[in-house]
């Protein structure tokens, strides 16, 4: 009986041992490294998304901050995407996200390349032909289409697109092409260039409308593109309309709005406080000629401006406001009833008369001084409210009620610190 029991106990022990081995293999006491056997080695490439999120949200200091432009870290990712944080110096190739769909206000010297989805825009600009270089591009685009069924279709388009000598005749030629426009898909149906021909004819039919719109392209403003927070770049001055004012996207002053202790290198090294537009682009609206021509020497500003409403006898305490720290920003530490007067006066509550601090006068560049003297006390100049432009807590609805007399200049103040949606 003992001889028959021993193999049974051995079999039970073997089964228990095998089941224990199987369980130890199934439930890993030592978890494997993330990354499959034949896949990437355990390292950065095999981190899971959850691990990246945990690494990215370590109390605002993320271990993957240099990759947060690429979408790994979550803590500083929104700041990076909005251009509040400068790109890392160790990764200079990670530039600012200049989307192709970014809306520019088209001006004379600067033209972004047209989108591939908008091939009809180049022939669509008849008034811009004598000024711009895309005329040669349009001529090159149309030349391969001339041998096709194009000349019997459009008798006026060949001399129209061939050179700029016929450019003054475009408003006369374009209305004559309105009847043949529906026939373009019929004639060029089998042509591989049919969509381009149809779009050219369609844009030619809309030629007079675009020709009438040409003066709106040059209202006297110019656009200067810049990378986010190029700290070594000089202060740039651009004139844009109030619809296109994106605010200071990557300036250290805007970053100082979220973190009041951070003043930026330019301000601390040069001794300038927050009236300096260095470190970001400096745009002045030129919508109303009254606001541009009227400077600090010609009065407080345009009629009904917040500067006149923000007099010290209106209940404001200038002594209390002047006691603010120089690093205190108007968007963060202003009293709730003083939002508009404080923004119009500057970060410390003083009126922007001289406009630069006395200590900063020998250090300031002549262009910067000229801008200060010309546009110092104007509402449309984001000098003192450069920090407040980036303040997320303020909304345009909270700012409109305190200024009842500013119906003319209210849209400019309203749009001066709104981001342009891409």
Swiss-Prot record:
The intrachain disulfides are none
| Location of the region described as Disordered in the Swiss-Prot/TrEMBL record | 271-321
Q: Quick check: keyword Cell cycle in the entry?
A: no
GO terms under cellular component: extracellular region
The glycosylation sites are 117
Q: Which GO terms describe its biological process?
A: biomineral tissue development; cell adhesion; odontogenesis of dentin-containing tooth; regulation of cell population proliferation
Q: In which tissues is it expressed?
A: Ameloblast-specific.
- Output the Pfam families linked to this UniProt entry: Amelin
GO MF, one annotated term: structural constituent of tooth enamel
List residues, modification Hydroxyproline. Answer: 42
InterPro entries, per this entry?
Amelin (IPR007798)
Q: Residue positions of the PTM Phosphoserine? A: 48
Q: Which domain of life is it from?
A: Eukaryota
Q: Which family does it belong to?
A: Belongs to the ameloblastin family.
PANTHER family from the UniProt entry: AMELOBLASTIN
Q: What does this protein do?
A: Involved in the mineralization and structural organization of enamel.
Q: What is this protein called?
A: Ameloblastin
Organism whose genome encodes this protein:
Rattus norvegicus
